[in-house]
Amino acid sequence: MEAEEPEYGVSTEVPDIEELKTIPEGIMRSSQIPALDPEAQEDRDPSYKWTDGHRPVMNQSKVLRDMGDHTPNSMAIFFKKESSDMETSQEILLAEACNTPDQQEAVIQSLKDRLSRTIAAPELLACAVQEEWLDIPSKLDNRVGAELQSELMSLTLAVSKEKEEEETSPDTSIPRGSWPPCKTHPGETEQTQGSGSELLRQGKQLQLEATQENQGQEGFLQSQEAQGLEEQEGQEVEIQEEGTLNEGICFGGLLGEQEEVEEGFNGNEEEQKQGQIQSYMLLGGQWENEGLSGELEGLNYSERGQENRERRVWVLRDSEEEGQDQESREVEERRVATQYTENQRLVEKSEIVKRKQRDHDQTGKVMPVRDQKEVVDSGDRVQGNGDSGGQTAVEGSRPGEDSKPSLPVASVDPEVLSPGTLFPGISSSVADIPQIQKEPVCEELSPQAPALEPTEWSHQPISPPASFAPEESLDNRTHNSQQEEFRLRKGIEVVSASTSVAPSGTRDSPPFSPPNVFSSTATLSPVSSSVILPEETPTASASADTPHHCGPCETPPLPAKSSRYPCATSDTANPHSPLSSYTGVTQHLRSNSFPGSHRTEQTPDSLGMSLSFSHLELPQRPPKPAIYGSLTPRRNRRSRDGIVFSDSSTALFALKQDSEEFTSNPERPSSPHGSPTWGSPQNSAFAIGSPANVSSPPTVSMDMTIREALLPIPPEKRHSYSHIVERDGLLHEVASTLKRHSHPPPLTLSSGLHRSSKGSFSLVPDSTVARQHRPLPSTPESPNHTQTSIPSRLRYNKPLPPTPDMPEFYHPSISSSYISRMYRPLPPVPIIDPSSEPPPLPPKSRGRSKSIQGGVIHSGGQAKPRPNNQDWTASTLSVGRTSWPPATGRSTESLPLTSRCNNEVSPGLAFSNMTNLLSPSSPTTPWIPDLQRPTTKDESGLTEESEPPVRGSFRRSAPQEEFNNTRRSALGSRKNSEKPLHHQLEKASSWPHRRDPARTSESSSEQVVLGQVPNKQKGWNRQGLRRPSILPESSSDLRNPAAGRLPGSSDSVVFREKKPKEGMGGFSRRCSKLISSQLLYQEYSDVVLNKEIQSQQRLDSLAEPHGLSSPRHRRKALVSSDSYLQRLSMASSGSLWQEIPVVRNSTVLLSMTHEDQKLQEAKFELIVSEASYLRSLNIAVDHFQHSAQLRGTLSNQDHQWLFSRLQDVRDVSTTFLSDLEENFENNIFSFQVCDVVLNHAADFHRVYLPYVTNQTYQERTFQSLMNSNSSFREVLEKLESDPICQRLSLKSFLILPFQRITRLKLLLQNILKRTQPGSSEEAEATKAHHALEKLIRDCNSNVQRMRRTEELIYLSQKIEFECKIFPLISQSRWLVKSGELTALEFSVSPGLRRKLTTRPVHLHLFNDCLLLSRPREGSRFLVFDHAPFSSIRGEKCEMKLHGPHKNLFRLFLLHNAQGTQVEFLFRTETQSEKLRWISALAMPREELDLLECYDSPQVQCLRAYKPRENDELALEKADVVMVTQQSSDGWLEGVRLSDGEQGWFPVQQVEFISNPEVRAQNLKEAHRVKTAKLQLVEQQV
């Protein structure tokens, strides 16, 4: 490679360049557009003439400056046609200028620039451009011939001087205007001159390639505008190309002419044409037509003009879509002719470029390998200028694609496309760019969205060297770029030849789309763009508008105009395009997202360019859904128009580097035709300067989803060509699937980019720079590029903001050895059964990029294993493939091609866009952990660089890829699997795995393809449940091995709390897959009960009778704060069975009756409530009982009394819930719970009975500790303040078991009420309900027994008998009611006067006797009388006493202690007390017939009530009670319908149910339960 590199000492004819600066406007235009020799000009299409006639709006001064930088080459080109003498002199000058590899590379760059400019109007070239090419060059020669001739000598001298200066100071940056023209064989010049048709072929090939990439963007450019633009470009480019002869390449015929004129002077333009053709081919022909049109229009018009043209392009594109077939045929014919001519020319142009060029002037000359490399470099730059060059190449190679006339897109002004602008390596301004590498930026650019909005980058004239980072001398960069261009040219010549060989009629390459054109144009002039970037002209390259050269590849979006164009530039820039040639650009491409290890460091300028390119705003119309670069660059990479900079550009750059490793370099023998892949249409995409190198057919096969706005190019036009980028003569096959827009514009594949240490400016940026420039991968959900997947035009119109990962933008001075390290290609992704499963999401952390690094780049079907030492075979990426490493082992054939790539899938790079890698694709295999191994030292830079972008793109790409999935009908299988399960991240965010992607991705072992995740039940819990209530014991519990996601993220949710640190005694719990509880049971219970109350209230209000009942019975609103309800509102939303996605999305609900749905809801509530209950138990056990601090404050006895057997209760609940969930999962639509309850009834009895029985002692112990143990109190307060407790006290946790068992009985009762009478399900529910009822009865009995025994013991100590004594303590005796009353006695005085006396009497009513006692001091009682309960009777007093004696009742003792009858009159303080005593003294009543009590009032409990006396009824929220009597002071006596318990309760706790229908329904349900229970009892008997 070094031998082929231009010599530093070779002087360049800078003086000529300077003279050219003063050349007339027409000359400048010609200089800007690759100047063709007279013959070439004659061959050029009328569009070229039109270009001559129309000078672009861009400032000519800038063009002149750019020309000044590139003048020698441009002038040489102009002089070509002037006379054979001038041709000879030009050839001499070119030879001299290109004697050194640097010069040769510069020539290549100039050719590429020209090619890129020409590519601006690829279809123009592809269409009628051929005829006008020749004419236009002649006109240009006529106008500027004299001046060019006069200045030719000076230019020659300047070139010589420049060469000398280069020799003297190869490392120093070449001053603007002194850029050493790349050495071009005289044959090249002659070939360029004599083979207008050849140039046309090459240009059209480039156009075809560019069209493929620019198809969506520049495909709409009118051939006329493109031609006119080409003319202007040709003229301006001639001037600029004189400075950048190597960069100029004919795009189609126009560029062919221009390049021939320039090549006549330098012989490099033709190489550039070839390079552009290759770039254009890489662009897939889209950029060819659109790129040429776009660039030409950009040259001819100001940014506004470009925008207008883009709008026209859009309109034309629309019309083009209508007449797409006809235009396609026409374009294809033109392209076929052009491709054939250019292919012949390229093929014939071998090492003997001059002879073959001359021989094939008319038939199409094959540029020498060197020239081809130059063309490739220039093509890279052309791609940088806009993949128009590549499109032209594509057109030439795939005329079929060009058959469809692409609507003209606003062409880039010739100034913008000026050699300096387009090919920094060639132009002085390019020389100014120290780190400009000739990496194919066009890949990314080419895949940009369809017709870009006027891409101002293309308009921006080449900026002076100062505009670029001075870190690396222009000379060095020029020399390096020239050297690399030379190497590329050699390798690319072969490629371009083969590329051009691609049948012009091939419809596979899509016509240029205007957006692509701009992007290609920008890409084609990446160098120029870089140079232009310094320029402040609005049409300046992306870098001009955006400080992208200095910024990371993901540079922030450029201004509306320039940024759009820069984006286009980066996207469409050929790997060899000038921008691509920028070291920074190349680095950007590679470092950002391309897997290749050879990421070159972008120069500050190139970085800025690439960034700007990535942010170029494309035309408002979104590109067609073509598959763009595989890797999605950072968000910045998407242009405003939605164009995503193709990672393929980056990939191409990486490929170029890898191909350097894999394919023959100049060092590695690579015959001009050495790379057959290059020869193939796909390879031709990577032909010299063809945008295909960057956005080759893969780019052409840009994500159609992305290019949705663009008219979909016919599949035949979109047929992808294997993209092989030859860096340093190496061929690199770029996956057709690469999304040009996904990646930052790849640096041109110029040899300078890849040469180890030759270039004074290091091509490799620091790892930080690379990271910054690495494009973010697309969302794993969608295989399509996230960025490219944006279907709407608007989405394309919005440029993504730059997301540089590193503050450093670039490190221009990186040693080539370091470059080789950094750019070492990644190991190939192992090819796994493509149909097996899509790759899992790579970890978001560094592991992801690392895993990505371990791959090979598959160039030319060759896979070079990377350091991972893994036997991976690089699978060619399908056109639509976006994942960086293709879905492991996924071949391009595995995926149906998008419409653009119907005919063939390019072998492509082993790694496609990283986004695809991240995005799960259906047929691909899961990500292999080996890929995630730590990256090697060489790969570390790449990994670090790619890592941040991966995250960014991953985040951004989700929605985009969702859209892509929908858009890509061809990729149906992939789309199905790729559709976010969150198509959801849920919002992907709603999905648990979306909410926490890091955890799922971080564990590579658990990574799985999302497409493989069972779709059985999507996490219904997201409908309302905030989070899993219980954390599994281990991650394995929560993560399904297949899904590798959190339980919340998966279709199921686990109701599990973390096990206590101490463990659960070896008891393992099953993780729930479908149930999730986010609330503690205390809160959940409140929510559920509130729901029941509200439901009852709604029913009551809806059925409210017209006539109101008693006003005092009007319903009361539930009293609770709004905030509290809001805090508990989520539980209800997550506890509905019908809200489960599987159920909601099924048709089962349609076939179910309302009652059946209610039954299912009742059963499901039992499961959900148990999960919440278990969550609370886990906190009680783990947080409180197992607290070491709390345990230290308690004695063993206290600890035992306090927590009793709480842990046993938790274990039983765990198994119960596990069985419930398993039963539910087995049959979601008809699951059963009653049988599970019956199976666990014995366990419930075993643990709940002792725990509840001990509740009395538990309460006392707790109260005693709170009163006497300060340390306990302090520790407890601390524990209760923990957020896990949710401000709930320990006491609330301790009483949960009894509350739960009671509630469980009610839940079973609800199920029983909804079962079909006589059904087996009813029998099961009845048995379960009866079992729980018995358990509750036993618990109550035990609790009461203990309490009663204690009361008896206490009373026995306080009571004394003055009468007959009898034993008080008895197991069968309990206290029913006690209280102090006022006994009224009337005594008869001696005067027969009745005297009323009162005395206090304390009554103790037991269940079997009544004690009457007199209170004494010390709470002691003296019993004066007693009677058995059977002999007592109470009744109301009918006496109407006045005064305070109102609440009186009579007590009759039929047989007292003495055996006599006694009567007492008692007075109470309140009426309720009187009624309560009378009721207590009354004999037990028979059970009421509920159906006969329809007129009895009913109340519903709003607030729980804890009884204070034994005759009071304990109430729970939502209890319905039938009222039997009511006092005037606010007390009610009633019977609870659920269990028949009777008692008194305050009216404040309840509300009346006024609707008789609701009351009747309540009675009916209660009767149903009672009847079922009775039937069960009878059966058991």
Swiss-Prot record:
Keywords for this protein: Cell junction, Cell projection, Cytoplasm, Guanine-nucleotide releasing factor, Lipid-binding, Nucleus, Phosphoprotein, SH3 domain
Segments of skewed composition (Basic and acidic residues): 41-54, 326-336, 345-380, 474-492, 975-986
Compositionally biased spans, kind Low complexity: 515-531
GO process terms (BP): actin cytoskeleton organization; hematopoietic stem cell homeostasis; intracellular signal transduction; myeloid dendritic cell chemotaxis; positive regulation of podosome assembly; positive regulation of protein import; positive regulation of stress fiber assembly
Phosphoserine, modified sites: 446, 953, 969, 1029, 1110
Domain of life: Eukaryota
GO molecular function: guanyl-nucleotide exchange factor activity; lipid binding
Protein name: Rho guanine nucleotide exchange factor 5
Provenance organism: Mus musculus
Gene that encodes it: Arhgef5
